[in-house]
Amino acid sequence: MWLLLALLSIFQGTPALSLEASEEMEQEPCLAPILEQQEQVLTVALGQPVRLCCGRTERGRHWYKEGSRLASAGRVRGWRGRLEIASFLPEDAGRYLCLARGSMTVVHNLTLLMDDSLTSISNDEDPKTLSSSSSGHVYPQQAPYWTHPQRMEKKLHAVPAGNTVKFRCPAAGNPMPTIHWLKDGQAFHGENRIGGIRLRHQHWSLVMESVVPSDRGTYTCLVENSLGSIRYSYLLDVLERSPHRPILQAGLPANTTAVVGSDVELLCKVYSDAQPHIQWLKHVVINGSSFGADGFPYVQVLKTTDINSSEVEVLYLRNVSAEDAGEYTCLAGNSIGLSYQSAWLTVLPEEDLTWTTATPEARYTDIILYVSGSLVLLVLLLLAGVYHRQVIRGHYSRQPVTIQKLSRFPLARQFSLESRSSGKSSLSLVRGVRLSSSGPPLLTGLVNLDLPLDPLWEFPRDRLVLGKPLGEGCFGQVVRAEAFGMDPSRPDQTSTVAVKMLKDNASDKDLADLVSEMEVMKLIGRHKNIINLLGVCTQEGPLYVIVECAAKGNLREFLRARRPPGPDLSPDGPRSSEGPLSFPALVSCAYQVARGMQYLESRKCIHRDLAARNVLVTEDDVMKIADFGLARGVHHIDYYKKTSNGRLPVKWMAPEALFDRVYTHQSDVWSFEILLWEIFTLGGSPYPGIPVEELFSLLREGHRMERPPNCPSELYGLMRECWHAAPSQRPTFKQLVEALDKVLLAVSEEYLDLRLTFGPFSPSNGDASSTCSSSDSVFSHDPLPLEPSPFPFSDSQTT
């Protein structure tokens, strides 16, 4: 009843219901439960006390604000199921959730708004009546003016795609002015923008999250009252990813002369939009030659990008000697191509750098000494080469220097790693090129393999017995194999593994992609819920990448094979003898995938193709994410092309990835919830019967798939949170793991058995070639949010 009166007072324009209860009242005002946990909005005046209770039950209820549980003491507190605010302030506005302890079920979803009737003018109010305060002070009427013009000095905002932009126009006046926003001279309300906008009138601001190139333009704030108006314009430029290989600053690294025993720094300034892979190389002489038989130079890799490297653009040489003299190259590559520049280091005896300008005779003497020193340097270099040659032939006990030719494969792509590559890998991801100023940066047609030995990962080829094929991937095939002695703890036993290899007709790009995937897997490390790298075979034969074997195939087929009997839920292949899956088992599948994605997120790896088909299942029903290291050409996606199994990859893509090709961890969160929908439909196909052309417009309008019949509303609320149009409003994988962990703790095997509850609904037969319209039942036609999530996620997430 209290809620009904409050809502009626809001809609009728009367003062909002006072939420303060008298101390003599036996019952404090309580919110009655609302069916389907619909959001409730209450308007509270500034300074007004608030006292609400969560139903009639005092115990077992907790209040949360913006994802954080309220303390039991303080000005704003949650106490014995009550929400109490001593005096309502602007910062108290926001979303409050009352959750049942244990099950974390949402009892109430409440939004408190501040009544700004004293700071804005209604149509039926006389501005003159607002010129005096309640204390009797009279303020002169004044046209609008800027209160903080110094905060508006930055007129041009140039930001990368995916960032958040905030424009502010703080103003004042009497009567209190209103603010409106224009884009390129037209009224701007954000209704056609993916993710919408946030207009914070109390802060005189416009906020746009996850900006894309279509957001470019001139944004004007128009502030006006009855006495006048003022305006100010901002120019927004959204910077797209630059499709260019790294650019090296001219003149760097620079030729350097140093004395023996001094320290030298060589600087290489790299500009690259995509994450560059940088290496410092020293040119060496082998058997009296600087180049191999194939024309590629011999180089020693001195420094490479790794996770702990913060100054990879600087090469430090300590206590240099004559042997350090020579040519050094800074090599930088990204997904587009390679760039490099070289410099010479000259090392002289200390006395040879004692220059003087006292007399012409002294200058001539210095020149003679310099020439003599150069001759001595050449002799030393020759002696050093002979000595090094003797060391190689004599097999001295000192550790040999790692010398290698430039690896003959291209830098296939930018790793999906924001952090840089690990020092554990000695492999240099560069295509074999001749380091000259005239040749092109990339060569074509190279298919020979010349990979350096990586002792940490190399596995003897003769201990690997290949078996039957398991399938074909994007650029190769996967076969089952038996590896003898793969497990160090069981050196006399064999292990079943999967081996990735190239097809017979593979190109040099296919080779580069496989090498790139191998390197990414080295960098990522090990986790229970991802497919882990076990070893590689790079020497004396084709490249083999050895990974864990998942005996039960991919998750989609795993789910479909375990559908309960029925005419509408039939598997494509043979039915599993294990029987249908229970509800806790399905939640466990989602939980394990979320854990794997949380780990990949911690390693700065963006998957970009998360789906049930890319999750593999082991013999022990452990979920393992696969294909996180694949090179994917996101700028050349055919949106209308089906995969080999008939599914459209775009149906798993977030709107910002689909329309603007912006890939972040939050776009992976969107894909994860499509995967969650697949789980609770037991391998169903997303958006069944919806043509791709129509899907685009439906997603822009905010439509989302309906709740699967066998999915609880709590989990569907979780899906809707992850399908938020604004990426920053989606939960992180860490929050998803915590939420699913709570669900697992709350349910038991008796909670829900799919054998008894699966109804006739089957989304598995839909196909993108269908001519069905958007009226199909798979869509919910209410824009977000349809219903709240039961989990207290924060409203703003960082991507």
Curated annotation (Swiss-Prot):
Ig-like C2-type domain location: 17-115, 149-237, 246-346
Membrane topology, record value: Single-pass type I membrane protein
Entry's transmembrane regions: 367-387
GO MF term set: ATP binding; fibroblast growth factor binding; fibroblast growth factor receptor activity; heparin binding
PTM per Swiss-Prot/TrEMBL: N-glycosylated. Isoform 1 and isoform 2 are glycosylated. Full maturation of the glycan chains in the Golgi is essential for high affinity interaction with FGF19. Ubiquitinated. Subject to proteasomal degradation when not fully glycosylated.
Residues that bind ATP: 470-478, 500
Cystine pairs: 54-98, 169-221, 268-330
Segments on the Cytoplasmic face: 388-799
UniProt keywords, alphabetically: ATP-binding, Cell membrane, Disulfide bond, Endoplasmic reticulum, Endosome, Glycoprotein, Immunoglobulin domain, Kinase, Membrane, Nucleotide-binding, Phosphoprotein, Receptor, Repeat, Signal, Transferase, Transmembrane, Transmembrane helix, Tyrosine-protein kinase, Ubl conjugation
All residue ranges annotated as the Protein kinase domain in the record: 464-752
Protein name, entry field: Fibroblast growth factor receptor 4
Species per Swiss-Prot/TrEMBL record: Mus musculus
